[in-house]
From Swiss-Prot:
It catalyses: tRNA(His) + L-histidine + ATP = L-histidyl-tRNA(His) + AMP + diphosphate + H(+). InterPro entries: aa-tRNA-synth_II, aa-tRNA-synth_II/BPL/LPL, Anticodon-bd, Anticodon-bd_dom_sf, His-tRNA-ligase, HisRS-like_core, HisRS/HisZ, HisRS_anticodon. It is found in: Cytoplasm. Belongs to the class-II aminoacyl-tRNA synthetase family. This is Histidine--tRNA ligase.
Length: 419
């Protein structure tokens, strides 16, 4: 049926979209305070970008991407996440020539063929940040603190920050060998996905959601068991910086996240309010990704927050947003001979920065007043031919329940003085 939206998508309607606008404004304000500039990348990219950037063995690339061949016989994919596109833009536009670090943020829709459920859609929205050009553990702490700052400004409670270090190319081979040794006796009992991961990337077995695989891997070696001295020192410094700014965390040595590009710091923010241990955001460091995508060796770190999941968590916690609804002024006309003058007044109010509306259905004055009340309008300006000829209008303050005549010349000042 063509008149229904595709499964896993959602219409954000008036009355609901204001919450989104508040959230977007809040994140932009935080970005200004932290020194991040906005970047906007295409919604679709060449498929190879995600295969190389996200990782060919990830669930995203293997099962969840919306991929198609365009009329030029090119393989194109709707972006499933924002980091790979931002890295591509950094490399292609030679942003490495700018003073480093380069700090960017983005907001927009992402696409994954996933099983729709509460707070999880096939088209979903993310806010994310990326920092390129610094290996300083203080930057890791900054992006983590920034994510928590956003959640706290929204008013979210009962969040748990999980952090880990997933090592680097120096210490990963040791972990790979130990994991393969550990899982080898259990290989036939692992799920089919993890049997494939055993050879390609056994670290991903720790990320499996299968209860059987989780049970088997309960005593498996972890990244913290094999960190090289440099990675261990880096992780200790990240914790020190988080301690310095009062950010509480849980060391989770089983946290590896679902993307192959992470190195060293990985983190996730969890809540119980939208399901057991559900993630509402996370990120980490990816020091080899820019080089993998054709750029110079450049360290990077970032995070992404799921906007639908944030709004669902806020709803479950009873958080309300400061939303302004309806016009400040509604012009109610008396008689058909005043419509042209009312329309001119309407446009003048708008040019003065006042949100204003009028009737376009020929309603009676009583019906217009009732409609203005439904719009949650503060002032109703009642304009008739007699009042207009005298250069006045009757202004009713719907909040105070009072009305008075006001000169049309002073109408803007009258309204602005009371709002």
């Amino acid at each position: 049926m063509l008149t229904t939206r595709p499964r896993g998508t959602n219409d954000i309607l008036p009355g609901e979209v204001e919450k989104w606008q508040f959230l977007e404004q809040l994140t932009r304000q935080v970005c200004r305070e932290y020194g991040y500039g906005e970047i906007r990348t295409p919604i679709f990219e060449h498929t190879e970008l995600f295969a190389r950037g996200v990782g060919e063995t990830t669930d995203i690339v293997e099962k969840e991407m919306y991929t198609f061949t365009d009329r030029g016989d090119r393989s194109i994919t709707l972006r499933p996440e924002g980091t790979a596109s931002t890295v591509r833009a950094y490399v292609e536009n030679k942003l490495h020539a700018l003073p480093q670090p380069v700090k960017l943020y983005y907001t927009g829709p992402m696409f994954r063929y996933d099983r729709p459920q509460a707070g999880r859609y096939r088209q979903f929205h993310q806010f994310g940040v990326e920092v390129f050009g610094s290996n300083d553990p203080a930057i890791d702490a900054e992006v983590i603190a920034m994510a928590m700052d956003i959640y706290h400004r929204i008013g979210l409670q009962n969040l748990k920050l999980h952090i880990n270090s997933v090592g680097c190319p120096e210490c990963r081979p040791v972990l790979r060998q130990r994991l393969q040794e550990y899982f080898k006796p259990h290989l036939s009992n692992l799920c089919s996905n993890c049997q494939g991961r055993y050879e390609r990337n056994p670290l991903r077995i720790l990320d499996c959601k299968s209860e059987k695989c989780q049970e088997i891997g309960q005593s498996a070696p972890t990244t913290l068991d094999v960190l090289c001295p440099e990675c261990n020192s880096h992780f200790e410094s990240v914790k020190t910086y988080l301690d310095a700014v009062g950010v509480s965390y849980i060391i989770d040595n089983r946290l590896v996240r679902g993307l192959d590009y992470y190195t060293r710091t990985a983190f996730e923010i969890m809540t119980q309010d939208i399901g057991a241990q559900s993630s509402i955001g996370g990120g980490g460091r990816y020091n080899g990704l820019i080089e993998e995508c054709g750029g110079p060796a450049t360290p990077g770190i970032g995070f992404a927050l799921g906007l639908e999941r944030i709004l669902l968590t806020a709803e479950r916690q009873g958080i309300t947003f400061p939303i302004t609804r309806g016009p400040q002024v509604y012009i109610a006309t008396v008689g058909s001979g005043i419509e042209r003058q009312a329309f001119a007044l309407l446009q003048d109010l708008r040019r003065q920065g006042i949100a204003a509306e009028k009737d376009y259905l020929g309603r009676s004055l009583k019906a217009q007043m009732k409609f203005a009340g439904k719009l949650d309008t503060r002032f109703v300006v009642i304009l008739g031919e007699e009042e207009f000829d005298r250069g006045v209008a009757v202004v009713r303050d719907m909040q105070a329940g009072e009305q008075q005549e006001v000169s049309l010349r002073e109408l803007v000042l009258f309204i602005k003085a009371r709002t």
